[in-house]
A protein has these predicted regions:
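C-terminal peripheral helix-coil segments that are non-catalytic and often amphipathic
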Residues: 2, 89, 132, 136-143, ...
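Short, charged helix-capping/linker segments at alpha-helix termini
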Residues: 6, 24-32, 146-151
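Short, basic, alpha-helical segments at the C-terminal edge of helix-turn-helix-like DNA-binding modules
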Residues: 7, 63-70
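Short amphipathic alpha-helix in the helical subdomain of ABC transporter nucleotide-binding domains
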Residues: 8-11, 152-159, 181, 185
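Helix-turn-helix
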Residues: 14, 18-56, 60, 64
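Hydrophobic alpha-helical connector segments
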Residues: 60, 64, 74-100, 156-159, ...
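Amphipathic alpha-helical packing segments from all-alpha helical-bundle domains
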Residues: 67-70, 97, 117-143, 153-157, ...
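Amphipathic alpha-helical segments used for helix-helix packing
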Residues: 98-118, 168-172
Length: 214
């Protein structure tokens, strides 16, 4: 007899908590379905009622890891904030969510980041989703005359490089939260709109007074 979907969902949530416990104890060591079944006190065949295979398990882990950040991206892009505030909150709120994870359990976060590197194909879609929502903000800014002469992809690429320390969770470990303050991020976002503002163009950017090294 098939389990009701509510039971399946509850079982998956409980199993993801077991995954957390395994990662806390073992770090980023690869977790097999057999390991998870043993830790959960169930047979492997019963485990497959909740996750069809290891890929499905990894996808569920990634979905939970990124869930709050996706909610933030949706809320910010759908808000009525001025476009500069929208871009700031888009980065700042996700950064603060990462800081909360880091301060709560830094070792657990580090282990999950290492797992994400091992299975990047699983998390790639979430990385691309971040660019998608940023593109919506950039497009809105372009409608107001910002980033003139740049394509959406060009603007997104430049912006991502400028705020990289606030979007890369690894930076929390080698830069730290004391230096990575949201007040600095606000200044960076303001500078983005000033430097790539309404009078900016691809031609102007190509005529920089800085001598390019080769």
């Amino acid at each position: 007899m098939a389990r009701p979907q509510t039971d399946i969902d509850a079982g998956r949530i409980a199993l993801l908590e077991v995954v957390d416990d395994l990662v806390r104890r073992r770090g980023s060591v690869d977790i097999s379905m057999t390991d998870l079944a043993a830790a959960a006190g169930m047979s492997p065949s019963n485990l497959y009622r909740f996750f069809d295979n290891k890929e499905a398990l990894l996808e569920a882990v990634a979905e939970r890891f990124f869930a709050e950040k996706i909610q933030i991206m949706v809320e910010v892009t759908e808000s009525d904030l001025p476009v500069q505030d929208k871009m700031y909150q888009y980065f700042a709120r996700r950064y603060l969510a990462m800081v909360a994870q880091y301060e709560a359990e830094p070792d657990l976060l580090k282990s999950y980041l290492e797992i994400g590197q091992q299975y990047f194909e699983v998390v790639r879609g979430y990385v691309d989703l971040g660019d998608h929502y940023l593109s919506l903000i950039v497009a809105e800014a372009m409608e107001q005359g910002y980033f003139e002469g740049l394509s959406i992809d060009e603007a997104v690429s430049l912006i991502n490089q400028m705020v990289q320390c606030y979007t890369n969770p690894d930076a929390l470990f080698y830069v730290g939260t004391i230096k990575l303050r949201v007040e600095k991020l606000a200044t960076i976002v303001e500078t983005i709109f000033l430097g790539l503002g309404k009078k900016s163009s691809a031609q102007k950017l190509g005529q920089t007074q800085i001598k390019i090294v080769s």
